């Protein structure tokens, strides 16, 4: 479907557009008004966002690219309650101090990925605690709660799924959709914001905000959702077996971040190039046309471009160089490291223990099977002896050894007086 708005055409071609309220009216507004203010919200449940939020961050970048002003709403208030959307059970209530620290961490991450200058399209950060913390309960029930139908609220997926499964839904969580709806109204009053973007699980919350604005006789508001981020196996992205894929470099280094995207399924490469990079669509189509082993080149481009956006050009190039070094048996000094002590080396460390300690394998039994299957290498030499021990001879006067598990996981083992 062709739109008048270049922004809508762009996000549709790249795969961002999932659902939209009154898309014809939004198309008209975006094509006629060059100064639209839009917002995307993030809850503050961790000290960093992970790649599950990457689509929304890219949408912020694209809003700026097309001349619109984005608002980043940090849920300092709503995080105190917890969004029930897509959750099987209630989140633990975080202490206020933790939420405030998380806000600082998320701000630091976002400042590397979108522009917060004072220009026309410069993003602004707001915290909904600034207005939610001051709400008087009786006034809120009378002025806002009266516009919500419990019958209708029970039909939204975030509520219905929990109730159908006979899973507990607290009154605290039930209030979340009222507060998010109120956020949209508040942002319209304060900043003239008329457009909200969120993940597909936020559809009900977005619609509630639009309906509330109508009942309060405000200008027409619009909402758009992006698709749920799933990989080729249908699994929700954002976490791996070894933990979340964080966007903060202090929680996940640029090399591991690069490697995550280098190792995505072949079927995901084209889609991720469209969603997570700034490459022109013609260049992406050329990369999408690569087949078989050539697909690995497209994966390297994907990994490098995504890492540039999150960690900067220098870190992306260092990560790419380290990966090439590891795969081509060259100097692997740029790889992430794991430190052991001289005392451990003197006593000797069973290779099985080291594979487990570094997190390469979830158990010593799995480590044993990896070795038996010729999947483990020390300094690029395959080790198939399950009793193999890492000792001073393994280092041969070098400051580190390279430990490899399979073809895609590599780490350097360093020696220090004390473990870091």
Swiss-Prot record:
The entry's keywords: Aminoacyl-tRNA synthetase, ATP-binding, Cytoplasm, Ligase, Nucleotide-binding, Protein biosynthesis, RNA-binding
Motif ('HIGH' region): 44-53
Major localization class: cytoplasm
A single BP term in Gene Ontology: tyrosyl-tRNA aminoacylation
Residues that coordinate or bind L-tyrosine: 39, 176, 180
One of the record's GO cellular component terms: cytosol
SUPFAM superfamilies on file: Alpha-L RNA-binding motif, Nucleotidylyl transferase
Enzyme class: ligase
Subcellular location as annotated: Cytoplasm
Residues noted as binding ATP in the record, renumbered to the chain: 239
InterPro entries xrefs: aa-tRNA-synth_Ic, Rossmann-like_a/b/a_fold, S4_RNA-bd_sf, SYY-like_C, Tyr-tRNA-ligase, Tyr-tRNA-ligase_bac-type, Tyr-tRNA-ligase_bac_1
Reaction it catalyzes: tRNA(Tyr) + L-tyrosine + ATP = L-tyrosyl-tRNA(Tyr) + AMP + diphosphate + H(+)
Source organism, top-level taxon: Bacteria
Annotated motif 'KMSKS' region, positions: 236-240
Keyword Aminoacyl-tRNA synthetase on entry: yes
Keyword RNA-binding attributed: yes
Domain S4 RNA-binding stretches: 349-414
GO MF annotation list: ATP binding; RNA binding; tyrosine-tRNA ligase activity
EC number: 6.1.1.1
NCBIfam families in alphabetical order: tyrS
PANTHER family with a match to the protein in the record: TYROSINE--TRNA LIGASE, MITOCHONDRIAL, TYROSYL-TRNA SYNTHETASE
HAMAP family with a match to the protein in the record: Tyr_tRNA_synth_type1
Family statement drawn from the similarity comment of this UniProt entry: Belongs to the class-I aminoacyl-tRNA synthetase family. TyrS type 1 subfamily.
Subunit structure and binding partners: Homodimer.
Function: Catalyzes the attachment of tyrosine to tRNA(Tyr) in a two-step reaction: tyrosine is first activated by ATP to form Tyr-AMP and then transferred to the acceptor end of tRNA(Tyr).
Protein's name according to its UniProt entry: Tyrosine--tRNA ligase
Organism: Wolbachia pipientis subsp. Culex pipiens (strain wPip)
Organism lineage: Bacteria, Pseudomonadati, Pseudomonadota, Alphaproteobacteria, Rickettsiales
């Amino acid at each position: 479907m062709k739109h008048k708005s270049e922004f809508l055409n762009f996000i549709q071609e790249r795969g961002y557009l999932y659902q939209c309220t009154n898309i014809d009216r939004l198309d008209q507004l975006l094509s006629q008004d060059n100064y639209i203010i839009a917002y995307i919200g993030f809850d503050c449940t961790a000290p960093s966002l992970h790649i599950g939020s990457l689509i929304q961050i890219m949408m912020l970048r694209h809003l700026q690219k097309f001349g619109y002003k984005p608002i980043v709403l940090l849920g300092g208030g709503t995080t105190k309650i917890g969004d029930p959307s897509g959750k099987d059970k209630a989140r633990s209530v975080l202490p206020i101090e933790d939420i405030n620290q998380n806000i600082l961490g998320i701000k630091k991450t976002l400042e590397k990925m979108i522009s917060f200058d004072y220009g026309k399209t410069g993003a602004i950060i707001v915290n909904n605690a600034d207005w939610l913390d001051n709400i008087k309960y009786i006034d809120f029930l009378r002025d806002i709660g009266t516009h919500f139908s419990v019958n209708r609220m029970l039909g939204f997926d975030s509520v219905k799924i929990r109730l159908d499964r006979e899973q507990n839904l607290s009154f605290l969580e039930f209030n979340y959709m009222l507060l998010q709806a109120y956020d949209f109204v508040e942002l319209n009053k304060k900043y003239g914001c008329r457009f909200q973007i969120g993940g597909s699980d936020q559809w009900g919350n977005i619609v509630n905000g639009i309906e509330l604005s109508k009942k309060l006789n405000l200008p027409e508001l619009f909402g758009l959702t992006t698709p749920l981020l799933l990989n080729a196996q249908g699994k929700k992205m954002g976490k791996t077996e070894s933990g979340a894929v964080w966007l903060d470099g202090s929680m996940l280094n640029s090399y591991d971040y690069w490697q995550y995207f280098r190792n995505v399924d072949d079927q995901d490469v084209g889609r991720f190039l469209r969603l997570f990079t700034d490459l022109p669509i013609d260049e992406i189509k050329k990369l999408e046309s690569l087949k078989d082993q050539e697909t690995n080149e497209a994966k390297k481009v994907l990994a490098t471009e995504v890492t540039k956006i999150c960690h900067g050009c220098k870190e992306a190039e260092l990560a790419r160089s380290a990966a090439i070094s590891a795969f081509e048996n060259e100097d692997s000094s740029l790889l992430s490291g794991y430190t052991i002590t001289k005392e451990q080396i003197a006593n000797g460390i069973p290779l099985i223990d080291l594979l487990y300690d570094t997190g390469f394998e979830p158990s010593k039994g799995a480590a044993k099977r990896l070795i038996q299957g010729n999947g483990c290498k020390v300094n690029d030499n395959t080790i198939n002896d399950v009793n193999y021990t890492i000792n001073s001879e393994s280092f041969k006067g070098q400051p580190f050894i390279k430990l490899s598990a399979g073809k895609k996981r590599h780490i350097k083992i360093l020696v220090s007086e004390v473990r870091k």
